[in-house]
């Protein structure tokens, strides 16, 4: 049939491309058979648009290029919604075992982000106050000073919510809000993160307007130079309302965090590039000092970028 012929042509094209690419990297008669018969590990790193993950995985399987000693790495976003994410994961699982699949969020590789687990679970100083008994709210900010640059076509189908919030910012939120894992092993950390995500209060028609803000950057000045609006960027549909800025108020419905809002914000073409977490503590229940002494709430600031570090802001005598 024409469908089978098309699949065959796609398969052959993919196989030829893979072989050619490998020979380009290693000129000495590299063949696909070398991959399968050699003992060394092979990693398929899919640095491609997510809509190609399914096709690539299927072609690898159809060409017998999936074997015990290989791994596949996929980057975010894995799909554009729940259905496409399930479709991609099902296609990956059809060829690879779960322990062969690596779903990568490169933001978790940042030293300051990795340090969140150590900060929380290797120190006792914060644990007693790490809950709604002492914390008023938590802010997570990832601001970028650049526009979409040469990613207009990709970004126009994605937006800030899918590009940043559903991976980077939610990963940070999970590390901040999760309970202590049984161990530092990936499965244990994953299980505690999942509990946080399941506890997030869903948006409703009644609260979506007050708990979220979306926007696009306009014409302006960036780094001292004129910069065009998002709708005038190359590859962007001028009729689209894809957001380049999003701010959310999230709530976690569990004993530790009930009543503590989490404010997430991210955007492009912001004033400066910075990433930080601000833990704002509650004010003292009663001010015993003079009325002129304006006591500010304590703050723990975890700086991810540009200068990694920790600031603890307290009230002291002037």
Put a short name on every predicted segment.
Residues 1-74, 78-318:
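Secretory/organelle targeting and membrane-embedding segments
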